[in-house]
Amino acid sequence: MGIRKKLKKKICEYLLKKEIFTSTKTDVNKILSFLNMVRPSPLDIENIRVGGDNDGGYVVPNDFQGIKYCFSPGVGSISKFENDLTKKKIKCFLADYSVNPKFENNLIDFDKKFIGASSYENYLNLNDWIEKKLDGESNNDLMLQMDIEGDEYEVINSLNDKTLKKFRIILIEFHQLHYLFDNFMFKQIDKAFKKIMKLFHCTHIHPNNSVDFIFEDKNIIIPPLLEFSFLRKDRGNIIDKNLS
């Protein structure tokens, strides 16, 4: 994580701990409706863990057959997840301007760029990045694994539906979820999740193991970091609607 993003994270945590909001507080009913929207659905496809048991691993719907590529913006010190995917013959495209990793795996391709909502300077728009890497190849079964320190909302909201539908599986670490209590930020977060939930089932939610700060208001407790797993709706069926 770059210095700018570390500072931004600390400022956000400080403001929320002091109950300082950039706008009005979000109505509690809106938050409850949001939480109901994103809760996981029991599907006829099991989840398995890919990558490490701690940071670097994800709980993923076990539906890999036919997936050729995974796009993975945000690169950590451990890339066990991507290495495990390559054992399934899935090529992984990684991007992050803040690191200089060395990979000896020919199924891992790295770009020294941040992935953002638009392409400029050291940033590359996700739509543009995917088009560049696929180079005209028609592929409607990709994976997206994203950990970009709070920029995920702008990136998701900038995605066109054509690109979003190409992903069969989406794994995202969502940051700054404590800002659901801030009405302005709630709108941005809610918009991104509604875009995903229109096309995908949520299959799993897991708090990040490194979280040391949790925000609570009106008996609603929200960690700032949650890992979400999604499966495109045409790939799985809800097995018990009473639990969904």
What are these regions (language model features)?
Residues M1-S244:
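Phosphate/nucleotide-binding beta-alpha loop and adjacent structural elements of enzyme active sites
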